[in-house]
Amino acid sequence: MTEKKQSISAIREIFAAASETELPALYLEYEEDSRAGVQNLIQKYQKQEEALKKERERTEQMKIYEHKYEDLGWICGIDEVGRGPLAGPVVAGAVILPRDSKILHLNDSKQLTAKKRDELYDVIMREAVAVGIGYASPARIDEINILQATYEAMREAISKLSVKPDVLLNDAVKIPQVDIRQVPIIKGDAKSVSIAAASMVAKVTRDRLMEEYDKVLPGYGFASNKGYGSAEHIAALKEIGPSPIHRQSFIGHFV
């Protein structure tokens, strides 16, 4: 009497419960099982492993600056979100990651889905050594201009860190009035995990804030356009006029 084969659903559960180090042994154990469902399952996990390997390699490439300056002490990534919108604040993030950070999928926040950004935000907030967030209001942007307001938000983010950094990795800019060594990196959120993490924190923070504004200031579509000049937003601006969070210095062409 032949031994009854395990069901494919049972094998699927075994694979799902296996750790990464246990998978190679499972491939060997089931490689002779000719059922299409089993072979497809093996191929699925092998593809996932290959994708994970590539992501780890990509992430390691994004640690070049972190490795270069690690002997100097704590390294902090700085980035901002919201320089271009017609409404809402500019938000800056400052993040110090652990030296042995294993966080994957960090990248320019605009390249990721909202769901993935939310997931990464939670991981960063849980695992980071320190996180600081700074804001510059629409009124402040109008008062001192967007560039100076961005610098102000960045300085606030740095000041809110619970650990003082020794090196700042900045996305492209050099922040005035900061007595910490700065390394400006063009397109830094795609080249440094620290800057990418700061970008993620700033982006998610600002997006959530604009979604809250949409509830109290309906009609402009803030939840979807996040204050940027979409057709819907501009039409509403012309029809109902500016809200308290519009940047007067940005909307002259529309009102």
Q: Which residues make up each language-model segment?
A:
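RNase H-like, Mg2+-dependent phosphodiesterase core
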Residues: 1-76, 83-255
